[in-house]
Amino acid sequence: MKRVLTSVVLAPRNAAIAVIGLYRRIVSPLYGDVCRYYPSCSAYGLEAVQEHGLIRGGGLAVWRVCRCHPWAEGGIDDVPARQVQQYRRTRYGFVVAPSHGKG
């Protein structure tokens, strides 16, 4: 029961991860390497949502996109680290409970 509840709670986060992944594969290559920051804004957004969830990670991603403009200095801007890791990432980037897929 707990695994099902965890999967339901993580569904919006994983849906956002899928949308960002599609953007990175389809739209981002059309623009080329135009981001002034490292990692790129889409990579930052993906990691922020994976690490902090849809609300806080989405907020971090929006703030990052707002700071990325032609007059920005740019540079290295990593996603703030989370204190405690609650979930693990699959090889496809989706977030699952630590015990998901084991035993």
Swiss-Prot record:
Keyword Membrane on entry: yes
Subcellular location: Cell membrane
Pfam family, one: YidD
Key words, A-Z: Cell membrane, Membrane
InterPro entries named among the record's database cross-references: Membr_insert_effic_factor_YidD
UniProt entry tagged with the keyword Hydrolase: no
Any single Gene Ontology cellular-component annotation: plasma membrane
Membrane topology field: Peripheral membrane protein
Function: Could be involved in insertion of integral membrane proteins into the membrane.
Family: Belongs to the UPF0161 family.
NCBIfam families, per database record: membrane protein insertion efficiency factor YidD
Stated name of the protein: Putative membrane protein insertion efficiency factor
Organism: Clavibacter sepedonicus (Clavibacter michiganensis subsp. sepedonicus)
